[in-house]
Design a protein with these regions (language model features):
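Non-catalytic nucleic-acid-binding/docking modules located in mid-to-C-terminal regions
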Residues: 42-45, 88-90, 113, 132-136, ...
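Noncatalytic, basic helical substrate-engagement surface that gates or grips nucleic-acid strands
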Residues: 1-121, 125-152, 225-228, 234-242, ...
């Protein structure tokens, strides 16, 4: 969400009167505010990657090494986003040595054990491995709204027999976004065919004699690469983190703390949500803030929320994943089965 908000305004960045680029912050907050208003979550949390390396970086020096350096404006934005989250009384989760994906994987499993229905709003196909009858993906459509993906949907999409095969699929085909090598020379189509035939990487590697020609040679020569890629692609579900539901209960925002932050950032449209007694501290409408106001109206036209499932009377936990800075990911909303989508740019499922 942070990256997408930033690049949505890349041609006409949102600049406040101090010359600070607030595009990423504003796009994030607008989507979150709209989400909270319409969904009315019971539980919520936001998780970030740690500042230091994770176990994947320690195991593979080139993990995500191909990614371009994070724009300075986004780096500047992240601490302010965290300040806003704290003022909104939204817990921030972060575990040293583990990616936010692993935090979500662990929370999803623990929440499921506690009787929650878990929803993960994400574009990341890796999350397919976490899907169960009680854990679903909400994938934003590039046309707006969401597509809810359960076990059968994941299997149908990739021609798999079980959604857990997503791990082996990534182990074979690799993942260029994370610099996971996979088996060189084996793409998605071939990887799917191999899993349809053998069921798993382990069974494939135990029966390479059934392969022919160049494919047999590729697989036999890259056994270690395949197994290591599967390790890198596996989302951990054993992070040392408790699922403390009471601590994640959604609370009202602290306007005494939030309003000054909105004023400082010149988020005038968001400040209108504050109680009248707090919102009276107005900001002078400079030429810059007039431009910002127009951009806010434009973004309002982009922000959409659609429900892709019927309301459930049971407890619900939803998790949204989106990339932010410092190799971090803003990932977790724990909420009911409606999720906000901010279609900053067309997104295709990869």
């Amino acid at each position: 969400m942070i990256y997408r908000a930033y690049y949505a305004f890349i041609r006409a960045p949102r600049m406040n009167s101090r010359g600070e680029n607030t595009s990423a912050i504003f796009g994030f907050v607008v989507t979150l505010e709209d989400l909270l208003k319409r969904v009315k979550p019971t539980h919520i949390a936001v998780a970030f990657d740690p500042a230091g390396p994770t176990f994947r970086h320690e195991a593979f020096e080139q993990y995500k090494a191909q990614r371009q350096e994070t724009p300075e404006d986004i780096r500047w934005s992240v601490p302010r986003i965290k300040q806003l989250l704290q003022a909104m009384n939204i817990p921030i989760l972060q575990v040293d040595g583990f990616e936010a994906d692993d935090v979500i994987g662990t929370l999803a499993r623990k929440a499921e054990e506690e009787g929650f229905e878990v929803l993960m709003a994400t574009l990341d196909k890796d999350y397919g491995q976490l899907v169960t009858e009680h854990i679903s993906m909400f994938r934003p459509r590039h046309t707006g709204g969401f597509e809810k993906l359960g076990p059968a949907d994941i299997c149908q999409k990739y021609g798999l027999q079980h959604q857990s095969q997503v791990i082996d699929l990534l182990g074979l085909m690799g993942d260029s976004s994370d610099n996971i090598p996979g088996c060189k020379g084996v793409g998605e189509k071939t990887a799917i065919q191999l899993l349809q035939q053998f069921g798993s990487i382990d069974n494939l590697l135990a029966n390479t004699n059934q392969l022919k020609g160049a494919l047999q040679r590729k697989v036999q020569e890259q056994v270690d690469n395949i197994r290591f890629s599967r390790f890198l692609a596996t989302i951990r579900t054993d992070v040392p983190l408790e699922f403390d539901a009471p601590s994640l209960v959604y609370q009202e925002r602290d306007w005494e703390r939030l309003a000054p932050l909105y004023r400082e950032l010149e988020f005038n449209s968001l400040l209108k949500q504050a109680p009248a007694s707090i919102a009276r501290g107005k900001v002078a409408l400079t030429q810059s803030s007039k431009k910002v106001k127009a951009q806010e109206a434009t973004l309002d036209l982009f922000a959409t929320i659609e429900s892709e499932s019927n309301q459930s009377q049971s407890k619900e936990v939803g998790m949204e994943e989106t990339q932010d800075t410092l190799e971090g990911r803003l990932v977790s909303y724990l909420l009911n089965p409606e999720v906000a989508y901010n279609p900053m740019q067309p997104i295709q499922w990869d």
